[in-house]
């Protein structure tokens, strides 16, 4: 980065009540839970003028001191450990948001066109489509670089120095430094932050882009085509040999220059169909949902349809729909509606299995199926076949008793409309195996 921002009064701009007020409005819009002080959005808003005035005076007098963040563990999809988030207090979120609003317009014009994460007007879909275009241009090999604990390893001094190449007002840099070193509250004990920026704060995404912009510039200097979304970076080349060479030299740059760590076990060189990028993969020039993302969806359906409790089908579908509509909206970029159909079919099978399980005995199950229009002969042959409930859920008798149309009538969200050219593709990448 070069060309200093010719603005020496950024800090005064930050301290305007209007900036802090806009910061609060964005915090309110994003919702979120209280930090270590327990103050909620409603509590803060009740005395908004007093709180904003106090923040303004503390900033101007340099008595403002960010509180430690509250650490929260969020389970990763598929049960692969947890992701650590840091929840700042409401007042700290207001200040961080105001700083973000102030700095984002100054850094945005200089960020790479190949960077898509947490940027205005850019989305994961934009990144995936850009990756598709690069693969289709004749670069089917992917260097998939996984950064180990990226947010935890951000080097504070390097980050501040990087920001200082653009910002004249050192007071802003000092304030950001205070935020970075505010610490984390873990079981009542404050642990000071020597490195990293905890995920969960409004400012963290911008800071992460400032750090990784240095990687972007290096890749551009080398003439490499890539797509980066936060710390998820894919580099595209023409051959396996070139990919292996790029993996080695770029890893050396990341670890030597940026002081970050490459996870060699998770990083890989592969053809595009073998690489997951933001939950998608590029298969034969088209976009498909990655197998891992499909399996995670299957696992989610299982958690939403637990055994051992009485099930009201309409309530269960409402709960499932709340998740599935959002999930399917994100994955609507896939050129394979059959993938959505697969998840919808799995939802129905899980619910059929639960409906079977709710009958206390084979006798009651027979009565239920006959009542729902299944012949007595088929019912008896099915129920007394010694199949377990999961196997029964796939039988003709149970599917006749609870057909697809019945679930749709009860409110199941159907998003797999047959309107894409790849509906009949039976590639191993499209269906779960």
Model feature map: region roles:
Residues 58-73, 110-274:
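Conserved polymerase palm-domain catalytic core
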Residues 15-18, 66-72, 76-78, 180, ...:
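Core structural elements
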Residues 38-77, 82:
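Phosphate/adenylate-binding "loop-and-lid" substructures adjacent to NTP/NAD/dNTP-binding pockets
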Residues 316-362, 369-370:
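Non-catalytic, peripheral interaction segments enriched in hydrophobic/basic residues
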Residues 355-433:
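Extended C-terminal regions of large enzymes
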Residues 181, 252-327:
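A conserved non-catalytic segment of reverse transcriptases
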Residues 90-98, 132, 160:
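Duplex nucleic acid-engaging cores and interfaces of nucleic-acid transaction enzymes
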């Amino acid at each position: 980065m070069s060309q200093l921002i010719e603005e020496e009064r950024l800090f005064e701009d930050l301290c305007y009540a209007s900036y802090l007020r806009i910061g609060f409005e964005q915090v309110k819009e994003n919702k979120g839970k209280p930090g270590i002080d327990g103050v909620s959005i409603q509590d803060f808003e009740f005395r908004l003028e007093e709180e904003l005035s106090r923040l303004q005076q503390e900033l101007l007098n340099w008595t403002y001191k960010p509180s430690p963040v509250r650490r929260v563990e969020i389970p990763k999809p598929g049960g692969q450990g947890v992701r650590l988030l840091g929840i700042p207090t409401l007042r700290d979120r207001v200040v961080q948001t105001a700083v973000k609003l102030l700095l984002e317009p100054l850094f945005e014009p200089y960020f790479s066109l190949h960077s898509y994460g947490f940027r205005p007007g850019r989305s994961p879909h934009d990144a995936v489509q850009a990756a598709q275009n690069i693969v289709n241009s004749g670069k089917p090999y992917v260097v998939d670089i996984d950064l180990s604990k990226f947010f935890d390893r951000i080097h504070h001094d390097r980050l501040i120095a990087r920001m200082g190449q653009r910002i004249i007002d050192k007071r802003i840099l000092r304030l950001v430094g205070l935020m970075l070193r505010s610490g984390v509250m873990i079981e009542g004990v404050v642990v000071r932050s020597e490195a990293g920026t905890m995920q969960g704060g409004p400012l963290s995404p911008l800071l992460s882009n400032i750090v990784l912009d240095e990687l972007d510039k290096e890749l551009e200097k080398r003439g490499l085509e890539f797509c980066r979304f936060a710390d998820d970076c894919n580099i595209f080349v023409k051959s396996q040999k070139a990919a292996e060479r790029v993996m080695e030299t770029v890893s050396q740059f990341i670890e030597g220059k940026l002081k970050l760590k490459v996870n060699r076990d998770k990083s890989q060189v592969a053809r595009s169909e073998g690489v997951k990028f933001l939950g998608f993969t590029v298969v034969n020039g088209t976009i498909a949902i990655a197998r891992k993302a499909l399996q995670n969806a299957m696992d989610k359906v299982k958690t939403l349809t637990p055994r051992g409790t009485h099930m009201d089908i309409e309530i269960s579908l409402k709960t499932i729909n709340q998740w599935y509509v959002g999930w399917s909206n994100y994955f609507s970029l896939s050129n394979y509606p059959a993938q959505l159909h697969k998840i919808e079919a799995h939802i129905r099978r899980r619910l059929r299995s639960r409906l079977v399980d709710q009958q206390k005995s084979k006798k009651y199950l027979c009565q239920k199926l006959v009542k729902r229009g299944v012949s007595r002969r088929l019912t008896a042959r099915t129920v007394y076949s010694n199949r377990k409930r999961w196997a029964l859920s796939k039988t003709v008798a149970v599917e006749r008793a609870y057909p697809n149309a019945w679930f749709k009538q009860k409110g199941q969200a159907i998003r797999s409309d047959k309107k894409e050219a790849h509906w009949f593709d039976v590639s191993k990448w499209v269906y779960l195996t």
